[in-house]
A protein has these predicted regions:
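Accessory beta->alpha helical hairpin/"wing" motif in late/C-terminal subdomains of nucleic-acid enzymes
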Residues: 2-35
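Acidic, serine/threonine- and proline-rich low-complexity intrinsically disordered segments
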Residues: 1-2, 41-169
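Core catalytic DNA strand-manipulation module of type IA topoisomerases
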Residues: 12-13, 34, 39, 62-66
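Extended, well-ordered alpha-helical scaffold/bundle regions in very large, multi-domain proteins
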Residues: 20, 33-44, 48
Length: 169
């Protein structure tokens, strides 16, 4: 707020409905997603939603995503420290477990190829992808400069088994 007026950052935050809404908004405000491709944006945003079942070293698609993830972790760390100082916890820790899968699926790879060497079930994959699509829609509405890339990522992710099982998962 600026007095009684909601700031641009506040308006943008009001369009994000996720557990890590503040970390997502700060990621957007800091321009972390601005120079990424559509699928790189999806890969990075997946860390705010996914929860790995077992600890594995995650695969990171490329250096652009890796650099963005470092920036996001720095943002999350600042928020986490601030929350710790005030005895609150609203931001879940980023989880890189879906980055590679989102990147490969969005890149047009088949389901068997994407899930190879993963312990994720098809249902969990569809659910995670649908959640990512929902977040991409929110980000598209929150920052107009990211709208085109987010909508492009959605088209690339919302296909095949995701469409077929989307209403069931």
């Amino acid at each position: 707020l600026d007095g009684d007026t909601v700031t641009a950052s506040g308006k943008m935050l009001s369009k994000i409905y996720a557990e890590s809404d503040l970390a997502i908004a700060e990621t957007i405000n800091n321009g972390v997603l601005d120079k990424l491709s559509d699928i790189e944006i999806a890969s990075v945003l997946s860390i705010f939603l996914f929860e790995s079942r077992k600890p594995e070293a995650p695969k990171i698609p490329n250096t652009q995503v890796q650099d963005a993830l470092k920036d996001v972790v720095a943002i999350w760390s600042k928020l986490h420290n601030l929350e710790s100082e005030h005895d609150v916890k609203t931001q879940k820790e980023p989880d890189f477990g879906f980055c590679w899968l989102a990147f490969r699926w969005g890149g047009g790879h088949g389901l068997n190829s994407v899930l190879k060497n993963s312990d994720l079930t098809v249902g969990d994959f569809v659910r995670s992808t649908k959640q990512l699509i929902d977040l991409l829609n929110q980000v598209a509405g929150a920052k107009s400069e990211l709208r085109e890339k987010c909508m492009s990522a959605i088209k690339k992710l919302d296909r095949g088994v995701v469409v077929y099982l989307g209403g069931v998962a």
